[in-house]
Amino acid sequence: MMDRNELPFCNKTIDRAAMKRLIGKLVVCFGIASTTNILDQVKVLGFQQATEASISLGIDDLSAVPTRGWLVRDAEKQGYVSEGHYRCGSLHAIEKLRQSIEAWYATSECLKREMSPSFKMIDPLNPVHMMSVSGARGTISQVHQLLGMRGLMADPRGQVIDLPIRRNLREGLSLTEYIISCYGARKGVVDTAVRTSDAGYLTRRLVEVVQHIAVRRRDCETPRSLAFLTSNTGERRRGFLGTMPHQGLVGRVLADHVYWDVRCIATRNQDISDGLASNLMASSQPIHVRSPLTCKSIFWICQFCYGWSLAHCNLVELGEAVGIIAGQSIGEPGTQLTLRTFHTGGVFTGDIAEYVRIPFNGLIKFDERLLHPTRTRHGHPAWMCRNDLPLFIGNSVGTQNSLIPAQSLLMIRTGQYVESQQVIAEVRAKEFPPKECIRKPIYPNSRGEIHWSKFVWHVRDSICNIARLVREASHIWILSGSPSKFDGNSFFHKDQDRVRIKPHPIKRIRSHSEGIFEAQASASNCVDRRKGIQEFGTDSKYFSNWSKRPRSNYILSNVWLERAELENSVSLLMERCQKNIKKLDFVSINVQLNNGSDQDHIFATYENFEYQTIVSGIIKYGTVEIKPVNPKRLQLDGGTGNKSSRPWCRVVRKGNFFLIPEEVYLTHEPSSSILVTNNAIVKKGAQITNNIITKSGGLIRMRKRSRDATTIRILPGYIYNPEKQINISKRGNTLLAPGNRISDDIEVKNWIYLQPFTFRRKGKTFVLMTPVSEYNLSSDSLAQVASRFDKPKTQRRAKAKTLSFICCKNGEKIEVINDVPTQLVRLCLIIEWQKYLHETLPRKRNYFSLISVKISYLFKTFLQVNPMVSPPTQRGVRVDEIFRTSTPLGKPSPPQLDLANSCCKSAVNCQGIIHLTLEPATSFLILSPFNLSRNNSVTDTRDGGCGGEIGKYFYGSEDGFFCIGENKKKISLSSKCISENYANPNVEEGWIKARRASSNLGQRKAEEVGLVGTLSPISCSSIPHHLSLGGKNLSTRKGFVDYSIDKSEHQDFYLIDESKLLLKCPINFYVKKGFLDKPSYLPTRVFSREIMLISLGLLISESRYLHRDRTCFQSGQVMAIHQDYSLVRTGKTFLATRGANPHKSSGDILEEGDTLITLPYDRLKSGDITQGLPKVEQLLESRSIASISAGIGDLFEKWCQNITKLIGNPWSHLLGAGRSMEHCQLILIDQIRKVYESQGVRICDKHLEIIVRQLTSRVVASEDGVTNVFLPGELVELSQAERINRVLKKSIFYEPIVLGMTRASLSTTSFLAEASFQETTRVLAKAALRGRIDWLKGLKENVVIGDSVPVGTGSPEIYCQLNINKEKESRLASGGSKKLTKWETGSSLSGYHKKRDFNPSFFIRKELNRSFTRLHLDMW
């Protein structure tokens, strides 16, 4: 032996990895016994050195990292920058959170890296450093929290808390930081998400499923096996689950011979040792191994299918309870890993992406056509390359080539100068980590008005849900303000109040018998004030400078429409006026869009709800006179008449008709299935057949229509037994009016219908009196539409007439299905279109479309009749209400207040802002929303525009702005009005230039403005409006209202359509409180002669430069511009990326706490055990995690068609079902194993296979081929079903099923085990009623009754083996010369003797002297 002094001395620090390598080399070189001795000496040496050193921790040993201060300040600075970008709308909430997480995580990791070098340089013998590095106490992560910073914390759900803990445990935590720390680490009462009891309950359920599984035999002789490829091959083949690692092969038993070329290296039923596994790893052929999944019986398991015992590294012994071991091995890791306090205390850890940095300075060049723009996960602009991108970096020295991998993000542009070590790209990870889509709602915690800068998609994400998705990145603004409720007597406008033009709601009135006539009012003393468009037409005074009067489209008067989700028709409201009463009423008429109308054809129909019925019956005409009409003339454009096959009859003279109620049912069931007889009397809700229940009581009348069809009529009413039968029978089947008498003692007060009938048994005639419904058609309903008295007499007007139609013939039966009302009478409208136009059209077709006007980013929609060649695009709209009042001239007219609850909640309204001026001569621009703009979705892409179209037609004006005097006739240029009101010429010149610049800007963007809803492009966008003002106030397109004059004026604005027709739209104000709660004043002169950076209505963000060095200190919208300051309505801006789901539309009101938008984003799935345990439970309980797609049925049918070709066997469905179940078992095992492996816990696959085998060991008896063996839906053991199919001539049908742990525990063969688990009373009662027998095969039921458990030495197999050994010893001791024959030896070893008196298929154990209750018959 060498002298100790001659041995080499290694003075090196040995960490855990080096110690593992040392122990491995010792085992290989010296064996296990010598290695154990050496390690004991190392242990003794370590304790001696530690005792001599006497290392302990003190408060002075906890020294902080010197660089900690500036690293934390740098992270806080990055947080301030992200917060500023978030307020400006450059980032949304998710991107801000990601930036914060990345910044603080990078700071924390930098501190962790700096900690070890700091200790080595400053104090290498620091006890904290030595203990953490050696692993004696704590880890690097724990020391980092003690001396560096606590960092980011993760909540119990795995989500990162965005508020980092800047301090460490040495300095101490604040109250807020302590709460966050406890919430992440789940200490004490904060631990409410995951408890140890959850893991304990999981273990209990697992044990309940497999507690009866034990090793009973040596070999079950199954031909089945599992095929795997070794992990060294690195490939996956069709038909195999995947690869098998080296550790997975050790302890298994081969199911087939393994050959190396032609030499057999392993045989069947040979267990795989470590050396054999190493040899098999080099094989490229699939390896077939035995598995608990392939064992024949589900009540026990054999030695070869189980393999090695993990404790002894040898084949498992007979009688070992492997089921309980499997359940505990799966549930125990969850119990140990539930509390993260023992590890890192909930500290968040993540991975920083891999970046590509430039090696030296130079210019970057690459092909930009191979890139497409995108955003990084932090909100920075980037470009993604679809394929590998070649990149060239050049400088004065030379050019270097580089290749950027595909799907990488580039942070630079071509031709950009980059510096050394600058990040130019972010490389995508090679292995995609598991992600989950999360939808985060955004709560702005502010109130105000919503404004969208872009439009959204309307998509259908499910059958009954229509979602709105943002089609591209855009901003959403919340402009400050709050609505206010006025009482009905308040009508004064306040400063900064919002003025709204909205129709008054119309309540549904039952009585609609008023006539339609021309209102008796004089135009000289009444002013007609309406909500909506009042006058559209071509008046000669508006076209004095036109060389040729244009042919126009025209818009129907008194029509207000709203966008809705209807498919074809829109609703139109027409005026009705009650006679002798100055009150207007309206009726709803359906109009078909995207359709044409010929001359004198029906344009629309009105369905009065008074002439609707929800009761089936028979129509009987009374005094009404009708006239048949040609059905071809009734091709209703509104979409109502052309869908009905019933003939219509025109009403010529007023009168009445009746509906005799009755219920009619047609059944094809046999007479034996009808539960009532003819002429029987039933109550409401009586059962007629198995599928028919009466809705009302009455008399049953049945009639056989054919061999298999019977008509059942239920006639409601009263049965009368008359004394004078002859007189009554003469008056049968008649209608009796009120006042008539049936007999001396019965007088009729309402209309009734008499029907006599005879009872066969009594032979007597009775009378059924049925109350009927009367419908009156008065002359008012036949009146014509009133003429428009407010139009000039010289102007041509459209003539319209109304026709009433009855939709049923006399004696026709009306059938109501599903309580859907049936219309009996319709009022139709016919308009003579040709007489309304100013010139003859080349064709006699008119098309209906919508004009949608975008007013202040909101929409108003009107019905338009287009004499166009092709029909316009179809749009769905819904009607809003119209209201009109007549006010005498000379009296102030209070504005209508928005108090009523409109039935159309999403009505779109024109709005304006009221501003009061203190000085009459003050010039002030204020935002007024009477400007129209085109929807981007239907934008005309042609360059150029006609922003000054209207101005050119009006006296050659160029800038399109007008100032109207009080006479409302003189039109002058805005520049003249400005020069009259401004005393300072410099200011005047600046204002004129600013206004002209704004006008030119509108002309350059003409494709974005104009009318919306017509097929042809819009050519003009300038929409002036005029106001009647007093004093010297200025009125422009962005005008204001001065209420100093107590005078009621009318306001108009003009539209121009695609045919250059000028349309006059008089409107009125509708008041609601303004939204400027806290306006922001900018005391800066933002105008100059050179440039004006802001304009009315401009949305400005925080810190935006307005003029030179002056910035806006708060976001908002410019509402007014003064020569010395501007008025900004404060607001907040939020960024919404593509795919976001907005919950509010533009113009809606947002209250505090409302959800603004929902942002989707991808998040890495947490690998924490707290999220893994619910995942394991979800898998083992067989819960559905996602809905099945709608097309799965078609895919399954295609798969069934090709399954025969794939398998090539007429039993393909049976084989396919078995193969699918095997694949399902392997997937379950793989998913559960991955959850535990994510936490570093490895569970033996054999234990998982035992659990999964029990979950899939049962089948469900199906209804096809029902026999007397099993009931449909009954759970049956798979082996039992297979045995019965081998015995029966007619096989039973069953389907495979995957049971959950709980259901499998309650579906065993032992009712004692089920009752001891849960639902004790129900299980025992059910077992008693069925007379179930418990054969006491499992461990639990034997423990319950106090008997010995059938495992270990109590196992029958072990007991039999002991008896055989005793018998052998006794025979050898007695010295018997007779030797056992081979047959007797085999019989003795098996423990059975053959009896001639019994059936040879039964073998009774003779050696066991036990009671009959413990007799074990091996029948499986």
Swiss-Prot record:
GO terms for molecular function: DNA binding; DNA-directed RNA polymerase activity; zinc ion binding. HAMAP family: RNApol_bact_RpoC2 (MF_01324). It is an enzyme of class 2 (transferase). Its EC number is 2.7.7.6. In plastids the minimal PEP RNA polymerase catalytic core is composed of four subunits: alpha, beta, beta', and beta''. When a (nuclear-encoded) sigma factor is associated with the core the holoenzyme is formed, which can initiate transcription. Belongs to the RNA polymerase beta' chain family. RpoC2 subfamily. Its cofactor is Zn(2+). The keyword Cytoplasm does not apply. It is found in: Plastid, Chloroplast. GO terms for cellular component: chloroplast; DNA-directed RNA polymerase complex; mitochondrion. DNA-dependent RNA polymerase catalyzes the transcription of DNA into RNA using the four ribonucleoside triphosphates as substrates. Keywords: Chloroplast, DNA-directed RNA polymerase, Metal-binding, Nucleotidyltransferase, Plastid, Transcription, Transferase, Zinc. Binds 1 Zn(2+) ion per subunit. GO terms for biological process: DNA-templated transcription. Gene3D superfamilies: 1.10.132.30, 1.10.150.390, 1.10.1790.20, RNA polymerase Rpb1, domain 3. Zn(2+) binds at residues 220, 295, 302, 305. It catalyses: RNA(n) + a ribonucleoside 5'-triphosphate = RNA(n+1) + diphosphate. This is DNA-directed RNA polymerase subunit beta''.
